Amino acid sequence: MSGDVTPEVLAVRDLTVRYGRQVALDAVSLAVPRGAVYALLGRNGAGKSSLIRCLLGQQHPARGRLSLFGLDPWRNRPALMARVGVVPETPDAPPELSADQLSALCGRLNRQWDRAGVAERLRRFDVPVRTPFQRLSKGQKGAVMLALALGHGPELLVLDDPTLGLDVVARNAVFGEVIGELADRGTTVFVTTHDLAGIEGLADRVAILSGGRIVVEEEMDALKARWARPLEEIFTAVVGEKGAA
């Protein structure tokens, strides 16, 4: 059965991931509604990357269940990934190709490719489109990956710390323009980020991971109303001061 009848794009139930004796995720449950901007927060090592790997069908859990559009991504990865755009934490592309060449290559592989839309986003991010990927800054590489991830009009966009290495102008473009634009169009966005101030006004729902467990999972507005504090202060109060967000 197609997952299109479900109200959730992503549903996670009691998900546990282990690496040897180390437990990376411990009975994690969450649900990402269609059209929502969902923020997953946590310190480095909290388990965010493990959850994303499961979501993308790259990691098989030790226990529990994860469904994407109603299907198991581990068993249905090719079909599901055609509906998903991904921006990894570490940008990766053929080093000798420019952004223009990468977009052209993607266009030859995907009939739904919006080359004009990709070019416009690269212009917004002020990326030199004829410069080889290996010569771009880390922030520029991330901007290229974001523009390419949106090129086929995905139903779900997965962003793994998309503003890391970006300057203020580019961060504002990612949060204010790209994520806001996608939310207005009804695209579901699943984002991990260290930029809590940037995501606070855009996320509909938020989960906080600590030690592989979900310690907060609720609507952003309800969370802020309950605590009567900014998101950064709530995060620190929940997980403590030590380490990077």
Put a short name on every predicted segment:
Residues 64-72, 79-80:
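Conserved ABC transporter NBD signature motif
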Residues 217-218:
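ABC ATPase "signature
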Residues 151-152:
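Conserved signature/switch motifs of ABC ATPase nucleotide-binding domains
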Residues 157-161:
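Catalytic Walker B motif of ABC-type/P-loop ATPase nucleotide-binding domains
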Residues 199-201:
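A short, surface-exposed alpha-helical micro-motif characterized by mixed small hydrophobic
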Residues 56:
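Helix-to-loop junction immediately C-terminal to a conserved catalytic motif
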